């Protein structure tokens, strides 16, 4: 097994950064189940991009590192996929050729679709209102809800015919994307979206009641209470709720307040808000999916291309544990064109993998965090996760959070073990010198179009170094963490038991 610490370029000392700390790791501490909710699903560029080999290669790379199960993308109903058409008399016709290639490609690589039902086919739209993405999706309601229901039903029936109900019943169907902002121009926004959802749920469930449907897929954690109430009061099917949040969303938009909420806290504060709304609703316990989240919705190389993502991700897992069934990082790849075709490999794209198949520090962070166990042990620290694998070995994440692009303070953590029979561990590090491709990219002059030789060099430079063997002496182990540092410690159990001191 390989592991690493992420050392960042620099970072501002924040409330999460700390100088020195002793952490007691007690194998007999209270614990709870720790499902890997953060790596079950990833977002990606729109539907048609899934046909590219570069997309599929990146998918295979991330699948190998995380074993993720679902992928979500926009625009399966966009005209470029070609599913919907009408003849001169207005009679609908359907063509599932590209859709089949899209879903065949996902399933062949061991990933199921989380189907976002969007956007509106031009010939079905009530108005030709385009959102400003490069591919200009139509974001108006349908002009004829009977035809919309027909499209949804024909689509679902075709999927079942091709893949079988036992397969498709394991997928999820989400109605639209972020209807509370500029992806929906129905009036009023909430009421017209609820109408869309009602018709969609009706059509889908009439094909087969085992198909799973949910929403509202809102930005900024919006509408959850009202949406559940609408479904309950009108007996509308609801198998899960979904929404989105980004760490730089404003408190005004997410909470309706002027409270200052740090980037490190925003995502999981929103997760707690939604969790509490669901538990207080008519559908307590309904699964909660964050079908988009990230540290930023801007393109910022100091965030999504930088080691900053390691501590931010680790701390997000710590804070969001128990608040959601699944979170979908936006996105797994920079095969992505919402703002246009990328002009260089590192522009602050959302993806874990840059153009040319170059893994970023965020990819390495996910790869490292995949090593965590499936039980979480209680620990008195805001900078650590202590987990246990099914066979009993302990895996610990440690981090030193600092705000992106500014300087922070190095720290040292001392682990003191109790009820742990171990004299050695493996320590994995990722920093500006190890596993961060940024330095090599700058060294070669930041080429806009790296040559094939340069791409090979960049991919090599992005690799995590082998885990270092470290000794546990007198039940103690010290780990140095720079600002933006993330470490994974895998404790190696002794063959014979030792008495803790």
List each model region and its residues.
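Substrate-binding cleft and catalytic face of glycoside hydrolase catalytic domains
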Residues: 66-262, 273
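Substrate-binding surface in catalytic domains of secreted glycosidases
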Residues: 238, 245-281, 297-307, 339, ...
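Carbohydrate-binding surface patches
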Residues: 382-439, 443, 483-490
């Amino acid at each position: 097994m390989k592991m690493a610490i992420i050392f960042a370029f620099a970072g501002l000392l924040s409330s999460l950064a700390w100088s020195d700390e002793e952490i007691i790791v007690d194998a007999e501490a209270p614990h709870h189940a720790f499902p890997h909710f953060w790596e079950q699903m990833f977002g990606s560029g729109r539907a048609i991009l899934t046909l590219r080999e570069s997309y599929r290669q990146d998918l295979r790379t991330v699948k190998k590192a995380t074993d993720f199960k679902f992928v979500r993308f926009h625009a399966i109903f966009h005209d470029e996929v070609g599913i919907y058409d009408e003849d001169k008399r207005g009679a609908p016709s359907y063509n599932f050729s590209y859709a089949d290639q899209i879903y065949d490609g996902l399933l062949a690589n061991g990933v199921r679709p989380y189907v976002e039902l969007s956007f509106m086919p031009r010939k079905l739209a009530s108005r030709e209102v385009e959102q400003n993405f490069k591919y200009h999706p139509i974001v108006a309601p349908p002009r004829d809800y009977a035809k919309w229901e027909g499209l949804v039903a024909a689509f679902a029936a075709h999927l079942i015919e091709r893949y079988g109900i036992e397969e498709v019943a394991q997928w999820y169907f989400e109605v639209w994307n972020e209807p509370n902002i500029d992806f929906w121009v129905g009036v009023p926004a909430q009421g017209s979206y609820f109408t869309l959802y009602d018709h969609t749920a009706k059509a889908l469930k009439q094909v087969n009641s085992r198909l799973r449907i949910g929403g509202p897929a809102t930005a900024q954690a919006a509408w959850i209470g009202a949406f559940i109430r609408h479904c309950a009061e009108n007996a509308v099917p609801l198998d899960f709720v979904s929404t989105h949040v980004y760490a730089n969303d404003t408190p005004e938009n997410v909470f309706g307040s002027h409270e200052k909420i740090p980037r490190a806290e925003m995502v999981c504060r929103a997760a707690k808000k939604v969790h509490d709304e669901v538990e207080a609703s008519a559908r307590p316990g309904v699964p909660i999916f964050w079908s988009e989240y990230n540290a930023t919705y801007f393109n910022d190389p100091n965030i999504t291309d930088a080691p900053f993502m390691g501590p931010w991700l680790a701390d997000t897992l710590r804070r969001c544990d128990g608040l959601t069934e699944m979170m979908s990082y936006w996105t797994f790849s920079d095969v992505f064109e919402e703002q246009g075709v990328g002009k260089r490999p590192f522009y602050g794209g959302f993806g874990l993998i840059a153009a040319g198949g170059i893994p970023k520090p965020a990819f390495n962070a996910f790869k490292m965090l995949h090593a965590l166990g499936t039980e979480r042990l209680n620990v008195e620290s805001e900078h650590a996760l202590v987990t246990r694998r099914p066979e009993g070995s302990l895996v610990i994440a440690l981090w030193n959070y600092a705000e992106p692009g500014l300087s922070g303070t190095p720290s040292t953590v001392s682990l003191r073990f109790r009820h742990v029979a171990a004299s050695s561990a493996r320590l994995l590090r990722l920093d500006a010198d190890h596993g961060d491709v940024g330095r090599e990219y700058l060294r070669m002059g930041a080429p806009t179009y790296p040559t094939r030789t340069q791409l090979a060099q960049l991919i090599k430079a992005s690799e995590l170094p082998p885990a270092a063997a470290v000794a546990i002496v007198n039940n103690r182990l010290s780990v140095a963490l720079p600002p933006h540092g993330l470490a994974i410690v895998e404790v190696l159990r002794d063959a014979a038991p030792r008495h803790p001191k």
